[in-house]
Amino acid sequence: MGASDIGEMTSGRDWQARYPELCARAKGTNVNDRTLLATDYLNHVNEIIMLLELVPDAPECLEDCRAWRPMSYTEHFEASSIADRDLAIEAYEFSPPEFRGTFDRLIREMHRVIAGALAGLEAATAQGDEERARRVVELAVRALKTMVDHASSTIHGDAQVMDQAEIDGLMDMM
């Protein structure tokens, strides 16, 4: 990907000057010094995974699931208290497109899976269908954990990414 493509993704900022500076600042922090992404964001998704897993045996946890809201990467870190939150927010804009593009796509798909799971749980609960609720949770959690693993790999700079066909396959299971 060329510098002009990267420049477009970073709102026209001087990526070539800022990227090396941010990589240097990221060393020894919670922000990956190559991808400029931080795994702490995945805690937000892991929270809803944990809540979803509780619902079949503790239906009252559905209320907690309803209260959960998707957050963008920046929103998550703005609400975070981790020491490197300001760096995480600043560096995100300069994450190379081969990482950030994949990461952002995975996050969008995770949010879509979560919305579908919540809708499925609502319907199953309204009908008193515990078996269907378990199946919805099982499929959603499996898909979400796979996507979280891929997002984590992306954050750590693994070039192997989940292609759209793999994501669609997970979605078809739901």
Model-derived features: where do they sit?
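Acidic, low-complexity proline/glycine-rich segments
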Residues: 2-26, 74-78, 82
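Charged/polar, low-hydrophobicity segments characteristic of intrinsically disordered regions
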Residues: 78-92
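Amphipathic, heptad-repeat alpha-helices with coiled-coil/zipper character that mediate oligomerization
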Residues: 65, 71-82, 98-120
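Eukaryote-specific, cytoplasm-facing alpha-helical/coiled-coil scaffolding segments in long proteins
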Residues: 70-80, 133-146
